Swiss-Prot record:
Annotated EC: 2.5.1.-
The organism's taxonomic lineage, starting at the top: Eukaryota, Fungi, Dikarya, Ascomycota, Pezizomycotina
BP GO annotations: translational elongation
Residue ranges occupied by any GST C-terminal domain in the UniProt entry: 82-215
Protein name per the record: Glutathione S-transferase-like protein
Record-level GO cellular component terms: cytoplasm; nucleus
Length: 215
């Protein structure tokens, strides 16, 4: 399953005509604990980024995405063309991480066999994700926005939220649920279908009926 945290980085790179060298395979749990890795990235976290000249080393996917977005000709569109847009981009990136991604993980991981089912965790995640999607739906409804923070062009926050929802649309946001958030669905398909972005996200995978726990 594609790493949802790096899709936004790869998409920002594609829009900036940048090439990322991603080592394959990467032995998570081993390679990121090696002395060589920890010398560059003391936290041992992944994803991790090193610039081609070795001068920049970063962890945390949002920081890496910010650096990549700022490193090419698409930077003004991706990061905002004025202070107000830049602040709005940052606001919605925080929202995507705090209100969407963590709740998405709570409802998706057990459905793909990466975590044991916990009714409490799943319930809280479902409630949180539903509330977050309702916020985005209301926001998009004002003026029938095409994108979250910028006028007429996608920004880094569109890539970030689409990344956070990638697994959710694949495994949790089923046909019935999509019917309650039509603007969010249209926005998502618009973003992942954008030129160069679709090369990263691929053909949208939308679950018909989500898996439910056996009781």
């Amino acid at each position: 399953m594609p790493n949802a945290r790096i899709l936004k980085i790869q998409a920002a790179a594609a829009l900036n005509n940048l090439t990322l060298d991603i080592p394959q395979p990467f032995a998570f749990g081993t390679a990121n604990k090696s002395p060589e890795f920890l010398q560059k990235f003391p936290t041992g976290k992944v994803p991790a980024f090193e610039s081609s000249d070795g001068e920049v080393t970063l962890v945390e996917s949002d920081a890496i995405a910010q650096y990549v977005a700022a490193s090419g000709p698409a930077a003004p569109a991706l990061l905002g063309r004025n202070v107000a847009e830049q602040a709005a981009v940052r606001q919605w990136i925080c929202f995507a991480e705090n209100e969407v991604f963590r709740n998405m993980m709570a409802v998706v991981l057990w459905r793909v066999g990466m975590r044991e089912y916990d009714a409490g965790v799943d319930g809280e995640g479902a409630k949180g994700l539903e509330e977050a999607l309702a916020v985005v739906e209301r926001h998009l409804a004002v003026g029938e926005k095409e994108f979250l923070a910028t006028e007429g062009e996608l920004s880094l926050v569109d890539l970030t939220l689409a990344s956070a929802l990638f697994w959710a649309f694949m495994h949790y946001i089923d046909e019935e649920m999509r019917g309650r958030f039509p603007r969010v669905v249209r926005w998502y398909l618009r973003v992942v279908g954008a030129e160069r972005v679709r090369e990263v996200f691929g053909e949208p995978s939308l679950v018909a009926v989500r898996k439910e726990a056996s009781v």
